[in-house]
Amino acid sequence: RDLVRSRGLGDVYKRQGMEFGSSSNPLLLSVRSGARASMPGMMDTILNLGLNDEAVEGLAKKTGNARFAWDSYRRFVQMYGDVVLDMKPQSKEDVDPFEEIIDAIKEEKKVKNDTELTTDDLKELVVRFKAAIKKNTGKDFPTNPWEQLWGAICAVFSSWMNERAILYRKLNNIPAEWGTAVNVQAMVFGNMGETSAT
């Protein structure tokens, strides 16, 4: 952990000019697999890591775009709940608590698309997502960025042994013993506005 703090993220701080855990100039991270063989879509990824109730305000102020900041936050809470806290539905028959909440708010607001939700709607999504996490896991959503990071790193390592990754390796003759690395990178945003994409 000390190496990640000092060497790994220390270099990212210098390059990006931002600080992980800062409420005014937050560095947000993506945490993803770095497997030896490409396994598209098989391994878990967490984006926008480092956001909490303070950092989201800093991101809104820094970018001048509150909607973008809160959209990033609600996406992160949902992704973290799915991947790290094991709330992802295991089958098509399982209810997705996050999608249920999104559908309920869209119905309340009489809109069809996520893009039609306002900043206040996205704030409400975050509140309801956190309540769903508490209800389903018995734990609060972690607000400490370092706790978020360790949870995400462990989850990506664990995803090497998820069912879809095991099946993909069998079909493509990829040895299980190769294992995976975990890449921790500064975020590049695809949802900042009309000029950004993924």
Which role fits each region the language model picked out?
Residues 2-13:
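Single conserved hydrophobic/aromatic residue that forms the stacking wall/gate
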Residues 11-198:
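Conserved mixed alpha/beta core segments that line enzyme active sites in large multi-domain catalysts
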